[in-house]
């Protein structure tokens, strides 16, 4: 798991000076609390402060929704990879590189999200991108899951318990009486623990059961399949009395073609599943990248909007990405709070999700004197 802090602080004389100040605070004097990378947000159309205030709630909801779609795509990719889930990490990328590299080198995508558009329009464009992926994921996953479920059901009947398993691949023509007007062969699944009861009672389960006709055809850990011969006219009586002893009559009429047809069906569905798997995995890889990069652009919009609302106009702030190791996070937080404590006019400095006292944070999960957003990359661990 990687945790990134996307923060912004007001520009000194220039944003570059702010960046250098942050670098010195996080990496200087031998502290090495965290790497510090520029988070490049272009100048966007500010509009009115009222419009920015109105956007904060929309962007917050979109942020949560987009992260959720990222996690759904990653989780489903792990599900599709099945016994190769250990390869999930290598399939999660952003653009041409890794998720970590994307965070370290974030650049606004001018082609997809032109900055001449108002922030509200950019928000709508990003929302449409993510919503479309979410919709497509539902339809594609449903189609693949239906095929996978059909194959699993057929394979279960071919390889599962003798109580449910398809008999066409177990019994042979010679196991059945063929062409008799009066007699028929009945296949009965008997629990292993009741074999003795079966041998003792099967001849008395109806009036016309052929003596000494019971034959064990096969067995597994739970059940044995017995064949016995009865008169056709007592079939229902025999079946009913079997159920009283917890013997299970398998409804089955032998057909030599059934086994071939069923195996052909399994092979056909397995082939369709394999053909669907490749394109589905490619779609998941491409669209995870699409949604993840959209998510970080949404973070950038949130940083920009909150920075303008906090630090005022003209726009003058520097956003950076920090990736502190867990052992350094508390120390880094203290350094940043000391560096920017003068910016706080709320009395809420140091209120965060871990340290806040219930009821005293005024409903705010995290608040710092600088703009702060967290990005946690734990898609692999959440998908297993």
Curated annotation (Swiss-Prot):
Gene3D superfamilies: 3.30.70.100, subunit c (vma5p) of the yeast v-atpase, domain 2, Vacuolar atp synthase subunit c, domain 1. GO terms for cellular component: lysosomal membrane; vacuolar proton-transporting V-type ATPase, V1 domain. It comes from the Eukaryota. Keywords: Hydrogen ion transport, Ion transport, Transport. Pfam families: V-ATPase_C. GO terms for molecular function: proton-transporting ATPase activity, rotational mechanism. InterPro entries: ATPase_V1-cplx_csu, Vac_ATP_synth_c_sf. Subunit of the V1 complex of vacuolar(H+)-ATPase (V-ATPase), a multisubunit enzyme composed of a peripheral complex (V1) that hydrolyzes ATP and a membrane integral complex (V0) that translocates protons. V-ATPase is responsible for acidifying and maintaining the pH of intracellular compartments and in some cell types, is targeted to the plasma membrane, where it is responsible for acidifying the extracellular environment. Subunit C is necessary for the assembly of the catalytic sector of the enzyme and is likely to have a specific function in its catalytic activity. Belongs to the V-ATPase C subunit family. V-ATPase is a heteromultimeric enzyme made up of two complexes: the ATP-hydrolytic V1 complex and the proton translocation V0 complex. The V1 complex consists of three catalytic AB heterodimers that form a heterohexamer, three peripheral stalks each consisting of EG heterodimers, one central rotor including subunits D and F, and the regulatory subunits C and H. The proton translocation complex V0 consists of the proton transport subunit a, a ring of proteolipid subunits c9c'', rotary subunit d, subunits e and f, and the accessory subunits vah-19/Ac45 and vah-20/PRR. This is V-type proton ATPase subunit C 2. It comes from Ascidia sydneiensis samea (Vanadium-rich ascidian). The gene is VATC.
